[in-house]
């Protein structure tokens, strides 16, 4: 379906943290009909996320931190278990996840594998998230992690089977984490032990 888009108004409502804009636009459909819409669009930049996994130990590394938006929407303590992630700012996606992995988890990852790029909330948020996986070993842990400044991130090294059960039980509710854990499950990467030693 081909659409012709004509922006009527694009007004910035806030630039306090990221950019919130109010847009009025018309869509001309393939049949020639025109529909006018008014929407708010939140531009927070693009991001990247990585799931660290160890085939030999059958473990994954996740993080737990407070997310105020989840608390507002009924998450009783606001704590969320997630994959390591961050906004790109001016970095390339791979550079971003390497930096975030050290800051949040303490691991300096080696080879990383990019899987895909996804819109996570396309109804009103512009962000595209770049998804990665990377194998880790105990020898790659150079710091305790925990994030920077006041992030207070808890690092969780969990058995892969436990992480999958936590998804099934609703304990892991972060979309990034669910997608990457299920990818790891269906890919067969965790079906056998790695030849690498820790």
Swiss-Prot record:
Q: Does the keyword Metal-binding apply?
A: yes
Q: Where does the motif Nudix box lie?
A: 86-106
Q: Does the keyword Magnesium apply?
A: yes
Reactions it catalyzes: GDP-alpha-D-mannose + H2O = alpha-D-mannose 1-phosphate + GMP + 2 H(+)
Q: Which cofactor does it need?
A: Mg(2+)
* Annotated EC: 3.6.1.-
Kindly list the GO CC terms recorded for this protein.
cytosol
- Pfam families found in the cross-reference section: NUDIX
- Nudix hydrolase domain location is 43-180
Q: Which residues bind GDP-alpha-D-mannose?
A: 38-40, 67, 85-87, 104, 127, 150-151, 176
Q: Which InterPro entries match?
A: NDP_pyrophosphatase, NUDIX_hydrolase-like_dom_sf, NUDIX_hydrolase_dom
Q: What is known of its domains?
A: In the dimer, the N-terminal domains are swapped between the two monomers, such that residues of both chains contribute to the active site.
**Its biological function?**
Nucleoside diphosphate sugar hydrolase that hydrolyzes GDP-mannose as its preferred substrate, yielding GMP and mannose-1-phosphate.
Q: What does the annotation say about its assembly with partners?
A: Homodimer.
Name this protein carries in UniProt: GDP-mannose pyrophosphatase
